[in-house]
Amino acid sequence: MSIDFGLSEEQLALRELAHDFSKNEIRPVAAHHDETGEYPWGVLAKAHELGLLNTHIAPENGGLGLGAMDGMVIAEELAWGCSGIGTAMEANGLAEQPVILGGSESLKARYLSPMTESGRERPIMCAYAVTEPGAGSDVQGLKTTAVKKGDKWVINGTKMWITNAGVADWYFVVAVTDPAKLARGGMTAFIVEKGWAGVHVGKKEYNMGQRCSDTRGLTFEDVEVPEENIVGQIGDGWKLAMAAFDYTRPAVSCAAIGVARAALEHAAQYATERKTFGQPIANHQAIQFMLADMAMEIDAGRLLCWKAAWMKDAGLRNTKEAAMAKAFCADVVMKTTTNAVQVYGGYGYSEEYPVEKLMRDAKIFQIYEGTSQIQRMIIAREMLSRGK
């Protein structure tokens, strides 16, 4: 059995494309979008024309059909530029993935194919609408319901912390269709369009970090959804919602590595320029150890991401490995950005320097797509249930 830690020529080209895009299009406007919270439509439009959006949609629906490993190299570079803008760009993938996995060909043609079309005034966006005010980590506690009435399903309920909610054209929604079963076949997934009667979009949340990412609540009030907008089969909602994470958690983890890498680069450069006691602080062992720890943990995290992605591309179950990558990389980015601020000292606490933004942006990685504590529960469950 051979092991290859290198990227293919195609993946190297993807990484170069994404890195150059981040350097030239994302980083120059990152501070503006952080300060204003303005959604980065201009950046997204350019990314869409380059093919950096919706990369996992299959060729038969107009996409590139990229694999999980391909997505890793793109996600890291986009987040290296700005994780807030990167999240705005990558959020489509979480809503698309359940449709890719379980949607009918008709559903894919209606909702995925238009997302790959060029020449639009703005890209079509979508959002994964599962979390609720009382059901975050505990997805089995969902209260949103869908009741069959005639040839339609009527949805009522509230969703919370939905990324892209205000800009999305459609939502992947999970609702309870059989309260007696819940996660064991009692939840069903639907595609709900933003413009339908009864869909109400809440106010934008102004968060600690990743401020240009559009996060809002959604309320569904007697929203009528046609039968053909069910994703998969009745009762597949929980399964599809969770299956998507095996694809997206490695990418989110690699995005965390992109932020950590940016923090390390800034800290290392500053350490060579800042002088104390007549020499650069990089000459002091205390600083060297901090930088060395950052570098070790970033490389270790990236390898966890790559393994989880490789397993998914190989058709192997990667739930445990995806959770390992997510938990480890989320903690790494929080530690790395915090230590980058420490290397800068008082300057690191100032908005005039880049590391305070990176530290604010980092925290959410320990929360969204499953908290670090939930990831550890998943890891333990997988280990104990499978005996390995």
Model-derived features: positions:
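Alpha-helical interface subdomain recognition
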Residues: 1-81, 85, 102-107, 118, ...
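Short glycine/proline-enriched turns and hinge-like loops at secondary-structure junctions
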Residues: 66-67, 138-140, 164-169, 183-186, ...
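N-terminal glycine-rich flavin-associated loop
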Residues: 86-106, 136
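A short, Trp-centered hydrophobic/proline-enriched beta-strand micro-motif
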Residues: 121-131
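Flexible, small-/acidic-enriched active-site or ligand-binding loops
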Residues: 141, 195-226
